[in-house]
Structures are given as structure tokens and as C-alpha cells.
Amino acid sequence: MNRIPALLAAVAVILLFAGCGGSNDAGRSSAQPAPRGHLLPRDFPGWGHEAIRPVPPGLFVVTYVGPKDRRPWVIVSDTEGVPRWWFNPDTPALWGQVLRDGSLAWARSFGDGYGLDRRMAYEVRSEDGKLLRLVRTKDSIVDGHEYRELPNGNVLLDTYVPETADLRRFGGPKRAAIVSAEVQELDRAGKVVWRWNSRGHIALGETGRWWRSVLSNPRRRLRREVFDPVHINSIEPGNHGEVIISTRHTDAVYGIDRATGAIRWKLGGLPTGQSLRVVGDPATRPLGGQHDARLDRFGRLTVFDNGKDRPRRPRVVFYRLDPAGGKAIYKGQLNDPEVSRSHCCGSARELPGGGWLVSWGDNPLVTGFDQRGRIAFRLHLPASTFRAVPTPPGATSIRRLDRGLSEMESAAGP
């Protein structure tokens, strides 16, 4: 691997940042060199960090494909904008994260929208780049939208399960090939210990306004056109035996009873008997093609709301759920004035030291917010990252990442 000295790399990054065109609320910007003792690869892509306000120290992961050479990158950065670890997978990575034991996991990506390619898997690697294992769902191809660690060491994954449905009332074929959304919980040995499928729980009618897009954008599988009426994109363990999922093609987030499989509540989308009444939200339709529904440390539901085809900017929106009272109470939102639209993708995660980290989907921008909801930094990337994911507290350190980089460099040779 060709490398250049960190000082020259810093100069290169500064020049690349100058072409980003981003505003600077505090009137200052910074672009950071490689970690001490390391050389940035010569082909390291453009990287512009805009420092605006102080932010607690922390680490996070971004992934993207270089726009010029199409080379995939998994990068761990600190909140000061210094790349601390990087890796070039053999296939593009949809998104990545540091796991609680310090290993890194990312979803392979083959540009198919969801899991259609049998090579699909989550790669789990050590900090020195060694492949530890591949993780896949059972009975159908794993999808790349979710890999959620649980406290007991199990993981929640999603898969898109093929089936047949009559879509004539929506303008589709009589015997259409579709995919339903399935959640699987796998133990450490890869055994499925719990699963749930949207079949019989999310009606095809809930796809609503998305049917035109779904029917006009099928995927091909086994020489057939396959339609995706649900499109699950996140899974989150909830409270009181609940699992929370986000499904883009229904504009909704659902709370699922693990014991019965029944839907306890629904937020957004077309109204059903489980729908929550939204209180106080300035948006008349609360969600639009949303992603990354999570519970924060205060128990609030947080959602990256793309606002797809809605008359508003993308936002991170907060709700206090009251299923017993049948309502969801709006608790605020975050925006970045540099982002006016978001067709897909995106994430919103709490920073361990306080504040929020937001990937704006198909925009090449990550924004850090402080605890008061003010923009603390922007990371301008050469291409979009599906998610930006903070590392769990205590999972790894700059020293460990530095050691892993050193071992990879030694193995690669001069």
C-alpha cells in the first residue's frame, strides 16, 4: 500500500476541505492528519472536519466507497476529525460498527437494495484486520440493514423472505413475488432463538403512497421481478418484552410483542388499530421514509426522519411514547441547515459523552451535535455513509486501534 507522510496528508486534507463549501458557524475549520506514528494511505479519500464547538472525546465509524477509484473504506474517526483506523474490504461495506468486545463488524454491500446476493454476510474482524467470523441469518439471505448486539451476547438481524402475494388491488400482478420483513435473534453459536415475520402483522395496504415506487422499482431474483412492500431498516430492543422496528415503505415504526408477535403500537404511516396519536409534532405527517429508530438513555424514541417527499428538511425527531394512553408526545428535533433533503439511508445515535451523531443518508455529511442540540462539528466526506455509529464506551481505545493499524502495516510490508 502506498503511503504519504502524515504532514503531507494533513495538507492534502486541508486542500480537499477547502473545496467542500461548508459553512462554519464558529468561523474556524480544521482538517486532521493521521494518528501519530502512522502514514495515511496515498489513496486516502477526501476528509474535511469542521470544528464549531467543543465536543467530548469519542470514536465513531463511517463507511463509503471512494468516488474516484471505487475503493471501499471502513474508517474509525475520533470526534476531533482524526482518522484513527482504516480498512479496505474486498467488497463495499454498507455500514460498520465497533462491537462491545472491540472487534469491528460491517455489512457487505452488493448494490442490490437488500439481501439478494448469496455472498451477503456481516464480516467481523479484529482490530488487526483478521477475519473472525461471518454472520448470516438462517433460511434466507441476511440483509445488511441491521446487526444489533444484545446484552446476552446474541444479535438481532434482519432478512427479506420471499413469498407470493396478489397485488392486483395495488396495480400489480396477481401472483407477484414479494419479500416480507423478518427479524431473527441468533445466539453466539448462530442458532435462531427467536424470529418474527411481518406476514400477517403488517398489511399490504399499509404500504400506501409507496406502492407506485415499489411497483416501478422491482429487484430481480431467480429471473423474476420481486417487490418490496415493507423494507425493514432497523431493529431495536425495547422495554417490557418489546422489539422496535422501522419500515421505510410504510413510513412507520412498530412496537412488537416478543411473546405473541402482535404489534402493540404503530407510529406514523396509515392509521391502524394500533396507531398512536402524535401530540405536538409540527409535522402533520410525522415520518417519511425514516431510518434508525432507537431508544435513547432517557427512554425516548429517536428516529432519523428522512422526510422523503414531505414538505420539510430531514430531521432527528424525539418522542415520548405512551402506548397505554395511545399517544406519542413530540419532544423536539435536530436539523442541519446544510441538509435540505434525504432520499434514503441515515442514522442518529447518542454520543457516549453527550450529544448526537447524525449521518444525513445520501448526503456526504456527518454532523455532531452537543448536549444542547447545537452543531459541534461537521465531517465532510467524499461520498455518503449509510450510518455513522459511535463506539460503545470502553469497547476500544485509540491505543488499541493504533496497535491494530501497526500490525496490519507490518503484515503488508513496505
Spans of model-derived segments:
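Bacterial N-terminal signal peptides that target proteins for export
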Residues: 1-8
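C-terminal motif of bacterial Sec signal peptides marking the signal peptidase cleavage site
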Residues: 16-19
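Bacterial signal peptide processing site
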Residues: 21-23
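Histidine-/acidic-rich catalytic cores in large beta-rich domains
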Residues: 26-414
